[in-house]
């Protein structure tokens, strides 16, 4: 019997240190789950809590669905009524969760790299809990990135040589940062478009910024990003924002849709602002993978959670 190539990780907080073969193994495992493959049987209970300090519907529900499909026991956590509001640190909250018997915590937080304090412990610290990053500020969004990779691989069967345009508010997007890094590592060619005020020179190492209409006919993937209004506090460009003008200049309308390559796809991490990033009646079009991305998210998050279960030898897995 062929030995399965399964990933084992102590935490899943970033795609930065993932090896290419680990990415491919996670995609393969997620595809296995999607086809109805059996989950590994847990020999002891595993307790997980979802700590979302920023609003979320898709990611939160997707993680909980993945957890339940794996047979984990999900313990509710309400940030609005947590002791964080009394000044408790995230580390101390995690310490409490750990003491109560929680094995894993899935966290979304507004602070970039919040997880560093939870996984890089000082000599006197004893926290022993697995951390899965569901998004840190404008830093990383590893689970969205991984489900994006799964969706691209499912459609094209490979990454090498694919041309991918990331369009929109790139500076404030954690999805963009995770995706550009991993796509480049996997051999895809990355391009950027969108308002230059929301583009940073630090992205030049991954690809170049071009006018949208010049990019569209040669791209395999159009990855659209919403404008992150909630992260624009004090940004003078926010006051000048006009949804109609943005759609005219940077959105995918019917004319641009028709200019795309026959086999090209549109992706969006959601939520979609209709008639801003994408014409509303194109959300469920043949090229748009938005619904498939959400579907794939459950199975990829199952693969990611399972990798941490194995890495921490929880539930009898290793």
UniProtKB/Swiss-Prot annotation:
Its EC number is 2.1.3.2. It catalyses: carbamoyl phosphate + L-aspartate = N-carbamoyl-L-aspartate + phosphate + H(+). One of its GO terms (molecular function) is aspartate carbamoyltransferase activity. One of its GO terms (cellular component) is cytosol. It comes from the Bacteria. The keyword Transferase applies. Pathway: Pyrimidine metabolism; UMP biosynthesis via de novo pathway; (S)-dihydroorotate from bicarbonate: step 2/3. Carbamoyl phosphate binds at residues 58-59, 108, 141, 144, 270-271. Gene3D superfamilies: Aspartate/ornithine carbamoyltransferase. It holds the Pfam family OTCace. GO terms for biological process: 'de novo' pyrimidine nucleobase biosynthetic process; 'de novo' UMP biosynthetic process; amino acid metabolic process. L-aspartate binds at residues 86, 174, 226. It is an enzyme of class 2 (transferase). The keyword Transmembrane helix does not apply. Keywords: Pyrimidine biosynthesis, Transferase. Belongs to the aspartate/ornithine carbamoyltransferase superfamily. ATCase family. Catalyzes the condensation of carbamoyl phosphate and aspartate to form carbamoyl aspartate and inorganic phosphate, the committed step in the de novo pyrimidine nucleotide biosynthesis pathway. HAMAP family: Asp_carb_tr. Heterododecamer (2C3:3R2) of six catalytic PyrB chains organized as two trimers (C3), and six regulatory PyrI chains organized as three dimers (R2). This is Aspartate carbamoyltransferase catalytic subunit. The lineage of its organism: Bacteria, Bacillati, Bacillota, Bacilli, Lactobacillales. The gene is pyrB.
